[in-house]
């Protein structure tokens, strides 16, 4: 467990405008920010000022220890929301897109097959572990500059998605053409395949299959 919180990364964020002329490239700047987020242990992921929830705030017939862990998780989510918000604010005044996605979720004593388990494991695939947030932000200046891309992003709201298409989506969004580019795996493409079956496979071979379905009505 780290003694540092994710906010320690904020002073190191750069926009392309902050780069010296010697380091600027015509294609702009691509950055990856890897957060600890709400990884266990949850109580170590946020400062005391974000300890808003306690065991007494958690309903149900769980044990005091279980309620305390859930409260710590909720606090870590609250803090993570603040950090992600600060990242977005940092880039809101530049020509930027921010994409936030989690690599996995957590189960907190709510998996009927493992009612005493909290966390994520390679051999269990409850819905709360495999369903993750996927957020896209585009700054106002970039929306004005590339309105077509912004319209494509808006059209993608609510589409069924799986994180394995993120690399293809990023490459296409950045205007990079490769022999491996597949528009049906580009979330923002008009040719995106919303009917693709999405399968998650655990380390022991267990599967969680999300059946294909049409894009939601708007």
Task: Please describe what each predicted stretch is.
Residues 1-218:
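Catalytic domains that recognize anionic headgroups
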């Amino acid at each position: 467990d780290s003694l540092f919180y994710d906010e320690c990364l904020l002073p190191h964020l750069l926009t392309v405008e902050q780069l010296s002329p010697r380091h600027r490239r015509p294609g702009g700047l691509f950055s990856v920010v890897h957060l600890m987020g709400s990884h266990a242990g949850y109580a170590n992921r946020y400062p005391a000022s974000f300890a808003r929830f306690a065991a007494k705030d958690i309903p149900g017939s769980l044990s005091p220890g279980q309620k305390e862990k859930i409260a710590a998780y909720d606090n870590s989510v609250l803090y993570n929301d603040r950090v992600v918000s600060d990242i977005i604010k940092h880039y809101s005044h530049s020509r930027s897109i921010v994409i936030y996605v989690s690599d996995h979720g957590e189960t907190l004593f709510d998996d009927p097959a493992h009612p005493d388990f909290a966390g994520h494991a390679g051999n269990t695939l409850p819905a709360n572990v495999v369903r993750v947030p996927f957020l896209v932000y585009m700054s106002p200046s970039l929306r004005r500059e590339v309105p077509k891309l912004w319209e494509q992003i808006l059209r993608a709201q609510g589409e069924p998605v799986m994180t394995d298409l993120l690399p293809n989506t990023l490459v296409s969004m950045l205007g990079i053409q490769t022999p491996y580019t597949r528009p049906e795996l580009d979330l923002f493409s008009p040719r995106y395949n919303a009917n693709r079956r999405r399968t998650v496979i655990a380390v022991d071979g267990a599967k969680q299959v999300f059946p294909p379905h049409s894009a939601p009505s708007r």
